[in-house]
Amino acid sequence: MRLLVDTNVLLELLLKREHFENVFNFFYQANIHKEQTCATAMSIRDIGYVLNKQLHDPKKTRLIQLQAYEMISKVINTSADAAIESIYSDVNDYEDSLQMIAAEEAMCTAIITYNKKDFEKSKLPVYTPEEMCEIWSK
């Protein structure tokens, strides 16, 4: 399985937010099940933006961005075609559309997010980290 991990899931772990333990468990289980976890380069950029706004410390921001790189198995680049397709997409949010298209291009099998409503038009199944862990436990 190749799983696209959405930005909000990565931020939960990196900023030790409400779902920190569940996301930690998700990555632990993904490793045990030898699943490939992916994020888009855009997500890594967005993480840097959010962190810099909160931390006001560019060095600390870069270190945490490196942690994000280390957590995932693969960084997915978005193609120019995906960018254009996202503009014409019927998905209202450009970034969500781009995530979905990038996941398809990278042959991901599912999207992992806490904002499932943002991915209602996804051709791929969409799960929270907790739901994915439940699937693995069966």
PLM segments and residue spans:
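Acidic side chains
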Residues: 6, 12, 46, 93-96, ...
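Acidic, metal-binding active-site segment of PIN/NYN-like and related structure-specific nucleases
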Residues: 98-138
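Generic structural signal for short, solvent-exposed loop/turn connectors between secondary structure elements
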Residues: 15, 82-93, 119-126
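A residue-level structural signature of the nucleotidyltransferase/glycosyltransferase Rossmann-like core
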Residues: 2, 36, 75, 111, ...
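Short beta-strands and strand-loop turn motifs
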Residues: 8, 79-81, 112-114
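PIN-domain endoribonuclease scaffold, especially VapC-family toxins
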Residues: 24-93, 97, 101, 137
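Short, well-structured N-terminal submotif of metal-dependent ribonuclease cores
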Residues: 1-39, 54-59, 121, 130-138
